[in-house]
Amino acid sequence: MTATSVAALFIHGDRSSRPEDTAPTPMLAIQEVEAVEGCGLRQDRRYFTAGDPGRERVRQVSLIDEGTIRRHEAVFGPIPWNTIKAQIVLSGDMHLPNLIGATITFESGAALIITKMRDPCFAMDLIAPGMREAMQGGQQGALARVTASGIITAGMPAAVVPAGAPVQAVR
């Protein structure tokens, strides 16, 4: 188990960036969010209700770690965290795509299973030309599915539990 914490939380606002935009639409910084099993983050515009037919359930929550952001900043300069389209930023440097199948547990009992790496969208090139290509191959974090409901707050302790290991809430 690897200890971490929630460095920042963001939700999608009224709309996401579109190809015709000249700058990425920033996400909204928040201090607390409700993770709902099988649905995602309740306050987010992309929250899925359990009855949404045909929705891919691996994409409920987007994650990135501070180390990944810092590596991109070393190449592209300062990056506003609310423009990289990740809902949860975790402290540390853990390269989340290497942890597919692992579970992130939070002090509140909320839990997310990492399901796949994220593919960067065109909006990354709006932050800095070439950033989208630099984020290929898992350099934009990972996607996760909510497996246990609970409140997640900025600064909250969390843990990454390897795939197959027993999952417990952080104490």
What are the residue ranges of the model-derived segments?
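Short secondary-structure transition/capping segments
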Residues: 54-57, 130-136, 160-165
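Electropositive, beta-rich accessory/interaction domains or terminal extensions
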Residues: 1-101, 106-108, 116, 168-171
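Glycine-rich active-site loops that engage anionic ligands at enzyme catalytic sites
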Residues: 90-147
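Well-ordered alpha/beta subsegment
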Residues: 142-171
